Amino acid sequence: MGKSILLINGPNLNLLGTREPHVYGHTTLSDVESNSREIAASHGAVLESFQSNHEGAIVDRIQAARGKVDGIIINPGAYTHTSVAIRDALLSVDVPFIELHVSNVHAREPWRHHSYFSDKAAGIIVGLGVYGYKVAVEHVCVNFEEKEKGAKAAL
């Protein structure tokens, strides 16, 4: 059976394509999810996506992933800067994760510069627009393939 990836998007990412397009672009979350599933499938992996504006729902979904997914890609949105609960959930399931941000959070308001996830993430993708999702999925899939060959991989 192929590897399994969980793609999680946090608050306001359901508005991709319409919310501040000068910052986030015009591609919708539905397009991002569909493209991500296609990329994963091209590597023999399955990608499931989940989006919520609610911290507890994200925690619940991460906990439900324990033992069922091989990698997580998460764009925590504004929870990046506030959520110890999501951080703790990610650490509790023992699944490597990639932290992803569409915008360059380090070039924005100073309060956006701190992340509760970066120090525990297997990798961080910042400021590549929605192309960052492609990079994240490709990275996770290539690392799955490298691990199957016995090579040391980051995820």
From Swiss-Prot:
Sum up the protein's function in the record's words: Is involved in the catabolism of quinate. Allows the utilization of quinate as carbon source via the beta-ketoadipate pathway.
Reactions this protein catalyses: 3-dehydroquinate = 3-dehydroshikimate + H2O
Please give the InterPro entries that the UniProt record associates with this protein: DHquinase_II (IPR001874), DHquinase_II_CS (IPR018509), DHquinase_II_sf (IPR036441)
> Which GO molecular function annotations are given, in alphabetical order?
3-dehydroquinate dehydratase activity
Q: Where is this site: Transition state stabilizer?
A: R19
Name the record gives this protein: Catabolic 3-dehydroquinase
Alphabetized PROSITE patterns for the sequence: DEHYDROQUINASE_II (PS01029)
Keywords noted in UniProt = Lyase, Quinate metabolism
Checking SUPFAM superfamilies in the record gives:
Type II 3-dehydroquinate dehydratase
Entry's EC annotation: 4.2.1.10
> Which Gene3D superfamilies does the protein's record reference?
Dehydroquinase, class II
Q: Which GO BP terms apply?
A: 3,4-dihydroxybenzoate biosynthetic process; quinate catabolic process
Quaternary structure (record): Homododecamer. Adopts a ring-like structure, composed of an arrangement of two hexameric rings stacked on top of one another.
Q: Which CDD domains match?
A: DHQase_II
Chain sites annotated for binding substrate: N75, H81, D88, V102, S103, R112
Q: Which PANTHER family match?
A: CATABOLIC 3-DEHYDROQUINASE
Q: Name one Pfam family in it.
A: DHquinase_II
Query: Which family, according to UniProt?
Result: Belongs to the type-II 3-dehydroquinase family.
Which pathway is it part of?
Aromatic compound metabolism; 3,4-dihydroxybenzoate biosynthesis; 3,4-dihydroxybenzoate from 3-dehydroquinate: step 1/2
Task: Identify the species of origin.
Answer: Penicillium rubens (strain ATCC 28089 / DSM 1075 / NRRL 1951 / Wisconsin 54-1255)
Does Ribosomal protein count among this protein's keywords?
no
Catalytic center residues: Y24 (proton acceptor), H101 (proton donor)
